[in-house]
Amino acid sequence: MDIFLCPVCQSGYRYFYTLYLPNNNIDVILFCDECECVWIDPEYIDYQDAVSNDFLVDKYKVTSCKILFNKEISGWSTNKDIKNSRWDNFIENYEQFVFQNIYHLDKNKRYPFLYLYATN
């Protein structure tokens, strides 16, 4: 089984994604680029470990998940985001989870979710 392939939809790939938190902080999650499933703990990344929108709303004390995915601030995680998160040890063995590595982009820039779909 390909650990990078989403175990829920089995057609998308999972990458680190940085959420915007209302207190001007950020948090890093594992996020499927196809079905948008979310995993919040590096110890739990299997099918049954994906969390719901309701769980995210409760965990981060927000009224809507849209706040967490604020397109002005949130985006595919930078190396710095990951290194400063609970995923730091996990990334040492799984660099393919870094969106910028796969698409050969600047690893210090946080690209928005729709980056690959944008037209210039």
Swiss-Prot record:
UniProt keyword terms in alphabetical order: Virion
Subcellular location: Virion
Gene Ontology cellular component annotations, sorted alphabetically: virion component
Domain of life: Viruses
Protein name per its UniProtKB record: Uncharacterized protein L48
Organism name: Acanthamoeba polyphaga mimivirus (APMV)
Lineage: Viruses, Varidnaviria, Bamfordvirae, Nucleocytoviricota, Megaviricetes
